[in-house]
Design a protein with these regions (language model features):
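Rossmann-like NAD(P)(H) cofactor-binding subdomain of soluble oxidoreductases
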Residues: 55, 62-146, 162-164
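NAD(P)+-binding Rossmann beta1-loop-alpha1 motif at the extreme N-terminus of oxidoreductases
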Residues: 1-53, 63, 90
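Internal alpha-helical scaffold of NAD(P)-dependent oxidoreductase catalytic cores
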Residues: 83, 94, 119-127, 146-233
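NAD(P)-dependent Rossmann-like dehydrogenase/reductase catalytic/cofactor-binding core
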Residues: 189, 196-200, 225-235, 239-330
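General beta-strand structural signal in soluble alpha/beta enzymes
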Residues: 103, 128-133, 173-177, 236, ...
Length: 330
């Protein structure tokens, strides 16, 4: 039995707490919100972020970040991407040298345009960084439905250890050493899912959505390779698998955001209605900026950035993108 700390009391952090508790580990879950701690400890459910899903018995929640970090065999971070640097900066003093820290956040940091494992490497230099990614809706994980994910770690021994500790017959882990690829897959599936949702909201048809998703995967591969990732990663669970799930489901916050935008709603209005973070909305700008600096052609991402961040008309950008589809008329 391992002593595990989970940093982040949202839906995914809670779901992973269930996975680890079912594996008979001692699990301490840190949440920023006092009401989340009270609900988990008192009612056995995260009423704020994962309502109506009873969580595994024996999970303890706390608002004390230092208690969550000190003396743990390994940690999982599941906080929104834009808060990761601040939270992990507070963890540094209490983290033992060589402690594995697994990033579960799927985003890119605004301003620095850093991927999540890059943020962890900067804020927690004493940690062994890993990434958990793949097709994994939190509600299904918490409900103990089958799931397959990728655990990426450059240290093969630590990666094997983490896979043994986390995996089960219902939560299957595929190991990888491509930390960058796993992180890029988690970012890009959110970006492309917004585009897929826009196509649905604009009633462009299933053919157009399939085209968007396929060409979006090509953008993901080009971007990942430019960042140093392995191309094969994007044909597995952390790439194609996660993209298939997210871009085709209205249960995805990113796809449903795209649908709302396609129906003519304004981005600030949609985001204001949501308690949980829609990571893709904050990732588009960073991916577009990185693509420009790396010289990577990413027309879907560029069109999204124009609409979400620069006030461009949606139909104009759709027409411009369609003119770029291979084989389209000039």
């Amino acid at each position: 039995m391992a002593r595990v700390g989970i940093v982040g009391g949202g839906a995914f952090g809670t779901a992973m707490a269930c996975v680890l508790r079912r594996a008979d580990h001692e699990v301490l879950l840190w949440a920023r919100e006092p009401e989340v701690v009270a609900a988990i400890d008192g009612e056995g459910v995260n009423t704020l972020f994962l309502p109506d899903v009873p969580i595994a018995a024996g999970i303890r929640a706390t608002n004390d970040l230092d208690e969550t970090v000190r003396g743990r065999d390994f940690l999982l971070t599941a906080v929104p991407a834009q808060h990761l640097r601040e939270v992990t900066g507070r963890m540094r003093a209490g983290l033992r040298e060589g402690t594995p820290v697994v990033s579960c956040s799927k985003g890119i940091e605004r301003g620095s345009h850093a991927l999540m494992p890059e943020v962890l490497a900067e804020t927690l230099p004493q940690a062994v960084v890993a990434v958990l990614s793949g097709p994994s809706f939190a509600r299904e994980i918490a409900s103990d439905l089958p799931c397959g994910v990728v655990l990426a770690c450059a240290d093969a021994a630590i990666g094997a250890y983490l896979a043994r500790q986390i995996s089960s017959t219902r939560f299957c882990i595929h190991r990888s050493d491509d930390v960058t690829g796993a992180a890029v897959g988690g970012v890009m599936k959110n970006v492309i899912s917004i585009a897929s949702g826009i196509a649905a909201g604009r009633r462009l048809g299933e053919n157009a959505r399939a085209t968007l998703i396929t060409l979006g995967l090509e953008e993901e591969i080009r971007f990942g390779v430019a960042k140093g990732a392995q191309p094969a990663t994007f044909l597995g669970l952390a790439g194609l698998g996660d993209l298939m799930l997210t871009a085709n489901s209205l249960a995805s916050r990113n796809t449903s955001l795209g649908v709302a935008l396609g129906e003519g709603r304004r981005l600030p209005d949609v985001l204001a209605e949501r308690r949980q973070v829609t990571e893709g909305a904050f990732s588009v700008e960073g991916v577009a900026a990185l693509a420009r600096s790396l010289g990577v052609d990413m027309p879907i991402t560029r069109a999204l950035d124009a609409v979400l961040n620069h006030g461009c008309e949606l139909d104009t950008e759709i027409a411009r993108w369609m003119a770029r589809v291979p084989g389209a008329a000039a």
